[in-house]
């Protein structure tokens, strides 16, 4: 069934039913009245600009936890549902290449532009937006509302790539009755933070601020990319970049992809007892992860722009596909996407308070981890990809490493990734 689908119950009923996840605060309600609901998308080509595979189509779904959600869909609505959540800086569009194969296996597959991204509207576009709108659990509420709006009570598999794994993981933790399987891509599942046990706080370790201070002492001074993306400077940099938006995405995809020279023969980062030692260990990573302190991300990417020959011969990320990201982010801006970093890193209060409600919970649905073999992101995990699944899961089904893929395996090697996902669905 195409077109929009009316939710089975009102927004008031939905919010009451979702009270176990925490109600909206008064501040959230006030901010909701001030959100920007219009964007210059009517001036753009159709979503995907004629690069979508046959059978993958865009659709708008209204009344989704205050949002109108733009999404891609494939397969017949009414079949078992697979929900694909993108990461940063991506869109639902990033799943286009795996959707047909999953749909052909008998599923209805949807990939939304998440809150803050793309053509999904209804969120506050200001830098000082209410942080509670971007907490992990409110973004889980977005997904529960979308599932309901589509006429479903269960999701056969929820998949999260990069930042999307945070939403997907918590969806599986708080609603295992609804989200029956979990796959995370390029990032291990998020486990709820721990509370002190037995009246004694856990000692040792260091804070993000202490690590950042040690990065600043390196020669040349460095900073963690997450600390950068959480800053107002990043928001301003992305509004005034020296290159075109398409050129930024070309360089960003290249540097984090499987062909980039610095992404070969990776060894996982070693856990270190002090911030000073950790800063030195992290400095092994390329500058797109541990950045020079005097450069923003656009300036960093200028130095990594691939050659014209590479661009002309790049089959997994054509110029037409690159231009889709360029045009969509030019229209939407970056502020909403950056809120996902900002409110996790500089406004921990509401987010951590909600997450601590689930301290001690494990992921109790069948779970799979997929990562590119040439992805530094997967090697930032203590112990690397091989360590995923040792704690926090009760039904971990394994890790699948994808060769000749970096941080974008669903776009770099879609046939392999879709086969892994379908195999997981059919075997559990």
Q: How would you label these PLM feature ranges?
A:
Residues 72-123, 161:
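Conserved HGGG/HGGXW glycine-rich cap/lid loop of the alpha/beta-hydrolase fold
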């Amino acid at each position: 069934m195409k077109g929009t689908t009316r939710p089975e119950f009102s927004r008031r009923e939905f919010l009451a039913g979702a009270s176990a996840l925490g109600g909206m605060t008064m501040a959230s309600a006030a901010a909701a009245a001030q959100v920007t609901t219009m964007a210059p998308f009517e001036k753009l080509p159709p979503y995907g600009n004629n690069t979508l595979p046959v059978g993958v189509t865009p659709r708008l779904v209204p009344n989704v936890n205050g949002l109108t959600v733009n999404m891609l869909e494939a397969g017949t609505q009414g079949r078992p549902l697979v929900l694909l959540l993108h990461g940063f800086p991506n869109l639902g569009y990033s799943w286009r290449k795996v959707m047909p194969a999953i749909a052909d296996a008998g599923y209805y597959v949807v990939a939304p532009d998440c809150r803050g991204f793309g053509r999904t509207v209804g969120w506050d576009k200001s830098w000082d937006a209410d942080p509670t709108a971007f907490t992990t659990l409110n973004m889980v509420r977005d997904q529960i509302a979308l599932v309901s709006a589509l006429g479903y009570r269960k999701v056969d598999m929820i998949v999260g790539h990069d930042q999307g794994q945070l939403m997907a993981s918590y969806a599986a933790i708080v609603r295992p009755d609804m989200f029956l399987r979990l796959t995370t891509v390029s990032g291990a599942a998020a486990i709820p933070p721990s509370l002190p046990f037995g009246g004694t706080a856990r000692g040792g370790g260091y804070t993000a601020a202490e690590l950042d201070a040690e990065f600043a002492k390196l020669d040349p001074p460095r900073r963690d990319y997450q600390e950068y993306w959480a800053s107002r400077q990043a928001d301003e940099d992305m509004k005034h970049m020296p290159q075109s938006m398409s050129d930024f995405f070309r360089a960003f995809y290249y540097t984090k992809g499987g062909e980039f020279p610095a992404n070969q023969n990776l060894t996982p980062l070693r856990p270190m007892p002090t911030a000073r030692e950790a800063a030195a260990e992290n400095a092994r990573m390329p500058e797109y992860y541990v950045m020079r302190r005097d450069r923003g991300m656009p300036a960093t990417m200028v130095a990594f722009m691939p050659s014209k020959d590479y661009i002309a011969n790049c089959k997994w990320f054509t110029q037409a596909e690159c231009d889709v990201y360029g045009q969509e982010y030019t229209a939407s801006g970056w502020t909403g996407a950056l809120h996902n970093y900002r409110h996790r890193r500089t406004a921990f209060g509401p987010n951590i308070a909600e997450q601590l409600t689930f301290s001690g919970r494990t992921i109790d649905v069948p779970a799979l981890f997929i990562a590119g073999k040439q992805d530094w992101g997967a090697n930032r995990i203590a112990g690397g990809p091989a360590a995923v699944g040792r704690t926090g899961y009760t039904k971990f089904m394994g890790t699948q490493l994808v060769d000749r893929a970096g941080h974008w395996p669903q776009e770099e090697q879609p046939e392999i990734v879709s086969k892994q996902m379908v195999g997981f669905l059919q075997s559990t």
